[in-house]
Each structure stands twice: as structure tokens, then as C-alpha cells.
From Swiss-Prot:
Protein name: Uncharacterized fimbrial-like protein YdeR
This protein's record includes keyword Disulfide bond: yes
Subcellular location as annotated: Fimbrium
GO biological process: cell adhesion involved in single-species biofilm formation
GO annotations of cellular component type: pilus
Organism from which the protein derives: Escherichia coli (strain K12)
Length: 167
């Protein structure tokens, strides 16, 4: 009888453990990206001095200053990098141009590329990396413009950010 009792206890004990040793599904998620090594950014800051502009020249809608050239340069692009994209961002006003944060009123900032395409907030431009020099350049130009006319005296200040991505 003792033997039967021991077997019964052993069977019950095993049954209890088997219930707790059930398998569970496990999911392992692995993430990552393979990206091209970045180029060296040579033009870390570009300052454009528009000089003194005269209100008498900025009274008519669409009046603007002369263009001022800007070149954003990248060097030492690795062989795996074939193109670079620049995305421009900045504060805009209700005209869609970059907002003048200075004290002059009715003045906006216009940015264009070397093909005369407008580069407004969120726009991008892609250039091919030179296969021999491994460099990339973004020739741009900026000017002050008065969309509605009647520009007032004051300062002109705008900040346009550039974010690069590599392909």
C-alpha cells in the first residue's frame, strides 16, 4: 500500500510540473540599416550678406535684391556613396518664402538652385558625387524679395537648415 501511495504521489507531482513546463512562443525582432558612410561636410556654415538694400527699390510687388551665390561643399565621399541629397528647412511666412526674422517688414528670402528651381521649406536637391574627386557640390543662390511690395526699413535675417542624406 505504501508503494501504491508513493507512486500516486509521484504521478501527481509529475503531472503538476508538466502543467507548468509548457512551451511559449517567442519572437525575436532584429532591426538595422545598411547605409553609406557619410562625406565630409566642408561648408558647415554659409553666411550671405545682402548688403544695404534701399526701400525705394523694394516698393513694387515682386521687387528683389540681386542674387548672392552660395556653394555647399562635401568632400571625401566614400566609393559606396554615389549621390547626396540636401533637404532645406526653415520658417516660412504666408507667401511660402523663407520668413524674414529681422525688423524689416514685407521682405522674404528666396532660395534657388543652379538650375533656377525654387527650394522652399522641405524641398530637396540631389547631386551626383564626382567619381574622380569623390566630392559633391550644391550651387545655390539667395536673395531678398518683397512679394507684396512696400518693404520697410530694418534688418534682414533668416535661418535655413540643410539636412544631408547619402545614397
Amino acid at each position: 500500500m505504501k508503494r501504491l501511495h508513493k507512486r500516486f504521489l509521484l504521478a501527481t507531482f509529475c503531472a503538476l510540473f508538466t502543467a507548468t513546463l509548457q512551451a511559449a512562443d517567442v519572437t525575436i525582432t532584429v532591426n538595422g540599416r545598411v547605409v553609406a558612410k557619410p562625406c565630409t561636410i566642408q561648408t558647415k556654415e554659409a553666411n550671405v550678406n545682402l548688403g544695404d538694400l534701399y526701400t525705394r527699390n523694394l516698393q513694387q510687388p515682386g521687387s528683389a535684391s540681386g542674387w548672392h551665390n552660395i556653394t555647399l561643399s562635401l568632400t571625401d565621399c566614400p566609393v559606396e556613396t554615389s549621390a547626396v541629397t540636401a533637404i532645406v528647412t526653415g520658417s516660412t511666412d504666408n507667401t511660402g518664402y523663407y520668413k524674414n526674422e529681422g525688423t524689416a517688414e514685407n521682405i522674404q528670402i528666396e532660395l534657388r538652385d543652379d538650375q533656377d528651381a525654387a527650394l522652399k521649406n522641405g524641398d530637396s536637391k540631389t547631386v551626383i558625387v564626382d567619381e574622380i574627386t569623390r566630392n559633391a557640390q550644391f550651387p545655390l543662390k539667395a536673395r531678398a524679395i518683397t512679394v507684396n511690395g512696400n518693404a520697410s526699413q530694418g534688418t534682414i535675417e533668416a535661418l535655413i537648415n540643410v539636412i544631408y542624406t547619402w545614397q
